[in-house]
Amino acid sequence: MKIRVYFFKETDPEIILRGNKISSQALNTIYDLVWENEFKNILNAVRIWIKFMEEEQPFGTPLRKKKNHYKISLGDIIQISNDFYMVDKVGVKKIKVIE
């Protein structure tokens, strides 16, 4: 199971939080892929969110050294296989990525 974490590049995540879907083009332009790994165990998005909230370098070295922020925060996206979850004020919510 492939896990990816995307950090939001913009300054106001409230705009993106209003909807429950995002286009794949927006995902590639306003988000940076900062971390990717493959797991054999089944993980859920909340466990990954907690891991990123609590640790300085969760799961090892990030893909990108230059980031807008260093901790997972509001508006960031966690991808687990083909499912996408957006970090909300508390926890995560499932979103749809459309072509």
Pin down the residues of each PLM region.
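N-terminal disorder-to-order initiation segments that are Gly/Lys/Arg-biased
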Residues: 1-37
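Short, conserved turn/kink motifs that form compact alpha/beta structural patches or helix kinks used as
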Residues: 22-80
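Short, compact, well-ordered microdomains
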Residues: 67-99
